């Protein structure tokens, strides 16, 4: 498998052609919870990229000495190690974001993308392609999260990355009762579900049109 694909293909395929949330429909549950703001979505995307890339690398590195009978538990131990590392890193250097993400950083271990890449690819290819695929799978997951979070934060709070983009003077007040009001639905998890559904639908349309050509 490794001989037939370039490093470039291993990195680029998960970003679009084999995007895990949009094509494989994986990692959807956490996407509903962490896309309220761009900060949390970006942090989660980078955290998953780190965990998936590093765990895939070590799963591949140990693939020839890992018996099939303990394959899954070995993968879980490796993934857990890197989840703990990123969780402690966020608590030490980005405490506010870590507090906002709460248990969802620890729940990266249950993210189907991480185990999926380790099981379906990392144990079958050398370490470098495994790392590139894992890291890019996380980035592919991350850009989907960020896209959803930009829409949710802008319409839900009027901000992007905490910066106020909709001027305060546009908002409803006693002097201007008919002014703008934030779209409260965007703050709720169902909005992420519908936005992801629209993105998946759009990607499927683009792929079907491309296949017809």
From Swiss-Prot:
UniProt keywords, alphabetically: Cell inner membrane, Cell membrane, Ion transport, Membrane, NAD, Sodium, Sodium transport, Translocase, Transmembrane, Transmembrane helix, Transport, Ubiquinone
EC number of this enzyme: 7.2.1.1
Subcellular location: Cell inner membrane
Gene Ontology biological process terms in this record: sodium ion transport
A GO term, aspect molecular function: oxidoreductase activity, acting on NAD(P)H, quinone or similar compound as acceptor
Membrane topology (UniProt): Multi-pass membrane protein
Residue ranges crossing the lipid bilayer per the database entry: 21-41, 42-62, 77-97, 101-121, 131-151, 153-173, 183-203
One Pfam assignment: Rnf-Nqr
GO cellular component terms listed in the entry, alphabetical order: plasma membrane
Reactions this protein catalyses: a ubiquinone + n Na(+)(in) + NADH + H(+) = a ubiquinol + n Na(+)(out) + NAD(+)
InterPro entries on file: NqrD, NqrDE/RnfAE
Function: NQR complex catalyzes the reduction of ubiquinone-1 to ubiquinol by two successive reactions, coupled with the transport of Na(+) ions from the cytoplasm to the periplasm. NqrA to NqrE are probably involved in the second step, the conversion of ubisemiquinone to ubiquinol.
Quaternary organization: Composed of six subunits; NqrA, NqrB, NqrC, NqrD, NqrE and NqrF.
NCBIfam families, per database record: nqrD (TIGR01939), PRK09292.1 (NF006777), PRK12405.1 (NF009070)
HAMAP family: NqrD (MF_00428)
Annotated family: Belongs to the NqrDE/RnfAE family.
Name of protein: Na(+)-translocating NADH-quinone reductase subunit D
Taxonomy of the source species: Bacteria, Pseudomonadati, Chlamydiota, Chlamydiia, Chlamydiales
């Amino acid at each position: 498998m490794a001989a037939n694909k370039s490093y470039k293909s291993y990195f680029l395929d998960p970003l679009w052609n084999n995007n895990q949330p949009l094509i494989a429909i994986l990692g959807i549950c956490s996407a509903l919870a962490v896309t309220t703001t761009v900060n949390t979505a970006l942090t989660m995307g980078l955290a998953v990229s780190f965990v998936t890339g590093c765990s895939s690398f070590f799963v591949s590195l140990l693939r020839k000495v890992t018996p099939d009978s303990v394959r899954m538990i070995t993968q879980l131990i490796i993934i857990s190690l890197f989840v703990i590392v990123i969780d402690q890193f966020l608590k030490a250097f980005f405490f506010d974001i870590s507090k906002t993400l709460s248990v969802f950083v620890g729940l990266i271990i249950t993210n189907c993308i991480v185990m999926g890449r380790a099981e379906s690819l990392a144990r079958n290819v050398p370490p470098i392609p495994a790392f590139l695929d894992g890291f890019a799978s996380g980035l592919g997951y991350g850009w989907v999260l960020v896209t959803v979070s930009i829409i949710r934060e802008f319409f839900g709070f009027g901000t992007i990355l905490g910066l106020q983009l909709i001027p305060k003077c546009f908002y409803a007040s006693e002097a201007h009762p008919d002014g703008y009001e934030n779209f409260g639905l965007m703050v709720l998890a169902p909005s992420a579900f519908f936005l992801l559904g629209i993105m998946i639908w759009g990607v499927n349309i683009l792929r079907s049109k491309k296949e017809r050509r």
